[in-house]
Amino acid sequence: TLTVTPPEGGSGAETVYTFKLTVLPTLKTVTFAEEGLEQNVAFAPETLNYTLKVPDSVTALTPTVTTTLTDGSVNVTYSPDLESGKIPLDKLENGKFTITVSDAETGAVKTVYTYTVERIGTYDAKITTNAVGAQVRVYQGDTLVTPGKNGVYSLRTDKSYRYVVVAKGYVTKTGTISQPALNKAGELTVTLSAVPAISLPKYDAFWPNFRGNDQNMAITSVKTPTGQIDAETESSDVELLWASASGSGYDSGAVGSPIFVGGYMYAYAGTRLLKLDPATGETVASANMASNSDFAIIPPTYADGMIFVALKEGRVQAFRADDLTSLWVYQDPLKGQSNSPITYSDGYVYVGFWNGESGAANFVCLTADYEGTSAKEALWRYTSQGGFYWAGAYANDKYVVVGTDDGQSGYTSQTAKLVVFDKRTGEIVDSKESYTGDIRSNIAYADGRVYFTSKGGYFYSEVLGDNGKLSGSKSINLGGMSTSTPVVYNGRAYVGVSG
């Protein structure tokens, strides 16, 4: 109400004006459950007209709406009427449907949202190949398209698509998909050729990777140098054999941790891969890498005559171990820091990347094959929020196991995961999400169990079954964060803890 009162001494009576306000009802959100829809603009309560592209394989739309008023004072109606909660597209008038929100009392105050439907042609496509165990991926731009039942893709006639077919022992093939290229069964046959035969060196490897063996246990019988220390002068009779300034600084320009293969020591510094004589420190051979590493922390990995290095921006590069000729470079589409050790198993390369505490990053499987070209495609990829940092994988003859970051800042979230994959297909065999803080250690293996630590300050162990399932969880609160890979030896476990 508004009351008008005459001034003191004035004439006239007090006047009261009464206003009745009616809030214009509007929708707050509108979504549809069907996939493959494209709306011209994002929904906004004040925008009343929209264009919606709908694949012709979709026969009805399933709307979910919310209103700005939530006290039951409004009604929502559809034209045409809903049938089993769906808007029937065969009953549209002039290709349009409306959603009306009105006051529940009279229905006189209302807002009408109009959607114009544009039907888009679709077709089914399936890619077949001669390569056993091949992985097929289809992209629309940079977006991965998910296949339906039996590997059949539902594609749109107004979009362009490309395929990638990768298989162990074969040269990767990429190309475009179009409806005219399919046979009568709706299939596109992609024939892969065998990788070219090359002769690689066969070296014995004393210490081929970060942890020295496939179990990531870092156990050795080699003795450290010994000598006498003079108590008065504090001098030692142990002599420095050699020192080589192969790098500079303390970041990616520094010399990384070495591996020992075929009587040589391999390391990298800056953008150079180095092959060194361990007796003299002399550089026997060197090669340019595609970039430098992120922090020169993780050593290279050797296997089957090849040296593998993890580099900046989500890269992995492979070299011949004898003359350091580059064989191929992988570039991950999500990029990221390459701070995790590379795991090699049966001709497959596994490594993860990191894009910040909550950023999405990939764990990838690559075939080690030289394909006659420098570019390498992943056999399969797994994306995780928080990614992989210092997280080396364990692989056996069937499975590969890796730990993830928790996807959040701090060290108290119980959202870090231990994931078991089929090592060849990338299918998730088992996964647990109950670990406190980032898992930033290698996954170590001994006697049927995997061992790892977390930044939340725990030492964990799980049984890894022959079927790839995890069970028999055990944990110990260490009292401080840990990124140390455990060692299990002679009935005891050894692990480092932050002070």
Question: Where are these predicted regions, by residue range?
Answer:
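Beta-rich interaction/scaffold domains
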Residues: 1-124, 130-132, 168-176, 182, ...
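Short loop/turn and low-complexity linker motifs enriched in small/turn-promoting residues
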Residues: 119-197
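Aromatic (tryptophan-biased) beta-strands that constitute blades/sheets of beta-rich domains
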Residues: 196-254, 266, 277, 282-292, ...
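Core beta-strand residues in small-molecule sensory/regulatory alpha/beta domains
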Residues: 33, 102, 137-139, 276, ...
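Repeat-blade elements of multi-bladed beta-propeller folds
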Residues: 203-211, 249-273, 291-317, 334-364, ...
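Short, polar loop/linker segments at the starts of domains and inter-domain junctions
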Residues: 38-51, 140-148, 217-240
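Cysteine-rich, disulfide-stabilized extracellular repeat modules
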Residues: 26-28, 83-85, 113, 121-123, ...
